[in-house]
């Protein structure tokens, strides 16, 4: 992939606008998960070390464009950055109306870009306004790289047209390098783990991976559809009957690894309006995939008869992981995902993991140190795996030589 990188730019005395993904959960003014903020700090610190005057922008939540709502304000993020950068970080709320004053060595956080009319529609005028704020634009938000919006793709085009430097920040570059290594230059065997509730939502991912993977491990509702495609009853389990023919086609293209045994629970013990809490008191039962009862729901893969799955992961040279293989939030149905995460950790291969549930499982089972790269992107991660063009990345590549 060919794009300019921030670490190679002369930023001394220049005003640098960094688009980060600071979209973190905030409850009552408190940040409950700071993972994205932690990931953004090295980029901001590097810009400061290079002598830049730093502007940072991001979205938070889904406010109504044109309306200020305090619950979507980035003020808690500004306070967090102040604490972790050991210097004041001012939140600027008037940057769309007047010039922003920032000196080299200082950091100013621009208020939520989604308050601005035209942000989501990639307004030319708003994109130009963002570009006018800076000498150098740094795209560092992989999590929004798949969206053509004013603060992602639009500003890149506007800044480049004005002859300004547009480049990828270290976080975005690392994401793209890791995905490129896993998908375009993988060492073999390449094994993918794809979990989730529906084949239909991951169909493009499965089709793309079937072309390049030596083996694919499927979990969750996706696995149920593949089990049904083998002619087995999945009882009351979540599955998609209309996707069975598609599952059969995918099974002809690559080696789909399925468990021989599963962990089920009686559907009558489950309150679907309070799913996770009701599972805490449900009785786990181990079944062969050939013996699932009509009132039973598959909720995890069983460790017995899954040795071939864990061995495939341990022996892989490249692992791509998106999605747990069971309801790992509940102890009785977490063993499959736990053993799988430990297999990833024990593998000597290069591993990349993406998706909120996947990262939550990695943290729960304390295998962070055993995963080569954890992607901060959700939708962007999936779209890259599907082979789709990420607008912000395409804009960086198109303007690299300009």
Swiss-Prot record:
SUPFAM superfamilies: Phosphoglycerate kinase. It catalyses: (2R)-3-phosphoglycerate + ATP = (2R)-3-phospho-glyceroyl phosphate + ADP. Pathway: Carbohydrate degradation; glycolysis; pyruvate from D-glyceraldehyde 3-phosphate: step 2/5. One of its GO terms (cellular component) is cytosol. It comes from the Bacteria. It is found in: Cytoplasm. ATP binds at residues 202, 329, 355-358. Signal peptide: none annotated. GO terms for molecular function: ADP binding; ATP binding; phosphoglycerate kinase activity. One of its GO terms (biological process) is gluconeogenesis. The keyword ATP-binding applies. InterPro entries: Phosphoglycerate_kinase, Phosphoglycerate_kinase_CS, Phosphoglycerate_kinase_N, Phosphoglycerate_kinase_sf. Substrate binds at residues 21-23, 36, 59-62, 114, 147. Pfam families: PGK. Belongs to the phosphoglycerate kinase family. HAMAP family: Phosphoglyc_kinase (MF_00145). Monomer. This is Phosphoglycerate kinase. The lineage of its organism: Bacteria, Pseudomonadati, Pseudomonadota, Gammaproteobacteria, Moraxellales.
